[in-house]
């Protein structure tokens, strides 16, 4: 049994707290006083995990130092736009003998950096920084539905985190040394998931969904290889695994956003209707689109979602344009 500190009390942060508290001492940093009072008295937050009672052994705090101090493993689980601030907040308290894990699936909307790159640019010292990702709806994982994820980072440390945080038979962790690939797969699948929601909203059928997932994976692979990631990672849990579950399920915020876009709504209105809960694909779309444009990477689905989100492109016209592109080989390049 070790001490685990979790920075962030959204759906995924609370789900991880519920899982890891079965084996370890878990302390969760909560951003707002109102959420802290709710969680510390009722051990639930239906805005994120509806009808799920959290383990009473979980400790909640509004003091970030209290969550970080004495924690062998510190896990940041915030939206990507708040990740840099989370790193700034924990920097005075975290030390080289601790392990930092990012469980945020996104890219920095201003710089396009992965979360581990953001962390390394802010936190001084030489501590190990890893990434946790994979097909994992918070609502299911918190209930104990069998879930498998991957932790990416240096070999010895990722193996230690794998062995320490796995909670059989509910939560299985694999490890990978391709941290960049693990991060990219987890971030870019959110873009394709928005498209998946549009497909669902328009009731286009299984043929269209299969084509989207397959061609979407091609785009993720092109992007990942340009960043130095390994292609085999894209065929693992953080790649195709997360892509399938996020594109196919209404539990995904990104998928739900796409369904609402198909009704003619603007993404800002959808986020407001959902208590401000973030669809990470919005930020990932901006970062990936701009990177692809600068580096001449062929990502037509990403470009289409960018134009729908930010240029008010007509969805039916955009779909017609995608399906009318010049014929080409099926290969990645």
From Swiss-Prot:
PROSITE patterns for this protein: NAD_G3PDH
Binding residues annotated for NADPH, in chain numbering: 12, 31, 105, 138, 253, 278, 280
SUPFAM superfamilies: 6-phosphogluconate dehydrogenase C-terminal domain-like, NAD(P)-binding Rossmann-fold domains
Catalytic residues (positions): 189 (proton acceptor)
Subcellular location, record wording: Cytoplasm
Metabolic or biological pathway: Membrane lipid metabolism; glycerophospholipid metabolism
GO biological process: carbohydrate metabolic process; glycerol-3-phosphate biosynthetic process; glycerol-3-phosphate catabolic process; glycerophospholipid metabolic process; phospholipid biosynthetic process
Keywords (A to Z) from UniProt: Cytoplasm, Lipid biosynthesis, Lipid metabolism, NAD, NADP, Nucleotide-binding, Oxidoreductase, Phospholipid biosynthesis, Phospholipid metabolism
Catalytic activity from the UniProt record: sn-glycerol 3-phosphate + NAD(+) = dihydroxyacetone phosphate + NADH + H(+); sn-glycerol 3-phosphate + NADP(+) = dihydroxyacetone phosphate + NADPH + H(+)
GO CC term (a single one): cytosol
EC number: 1.1.1.94
GO MF entry, a single one: NAD binding
Main location: cytoplasm
Domain of life: Bacteria
Binding site for sn-glycerol 3-phosphate: 105, 134, 136, 189, 242, 252-254
Described function: Catalyzes the reduction of the glycolytic intermediate dihydroxyacetone phosphate (DHAP) to sn-glycerol 3-phosphate (G3P), the key precursor for phospholipid synthesis.
NCBIfam families (alphabetical): PRK00094.1-2, PRK00094.1-4
Family of the protein in this entry: Belongs to the NAD-dependent glycerol-3-phosphate dehydrogenase family.
Descriptive protein name: Glycerol-3-phosphate dehydrogenase [NAD(P)+]
Naturally occurring in which organism (per UniProt): Brachyspira hyodysenteriae (strain ATCC 49526 / WA1)
Organism lineage: Bacteria, Pseudomonadati, Spirochaetota, Spirochaetia, Brachyspirales
Gene it is expressed from: gpsA
